[in-house]
Amino acid sequence: SERGLTPNGYDLRIAEISVRGDPEIKREGTVTIPPRTMFYVSTIERVRMASDICAQLWLRTTWIRKGVIGAFGKIDAGFEGTLTLGAYNATDDPVEIPIGERFCQMVMETLNSETIKDYSQRSGNYQGQTGVTLDPLKK
């Protein structure tokens, strides 16, 4: 949607949240993240990176100001799927996170040339993933 467009990229929204230690994946409402707890977010948006495009992910400052720390990597050229993002409530207080809320910004980068092997050819462990995915899809 146009609401996700930013001056430098695109905001990605929360589809699911999995809180470490809780076997239930939350898909609606507001999720309370306990203090000092790791959690995982999957994105509503499905991305499809061309073989000459990668992207950086940046946690929205809204969450940083609430004490959330994000552990993100780059989205590799050739990756396709939803994203699973690791985060941590670093405060001594619970943090409330609504499903559907904007969580991070994706900033795309053009590579100087196409990759020799894109993500699907190199490992592809999470290629095509949907929802919170903690284990590789391929072995």
Where are these regions (language model features)?
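DUTPase catalytic domain/fold
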Residues: 1-139
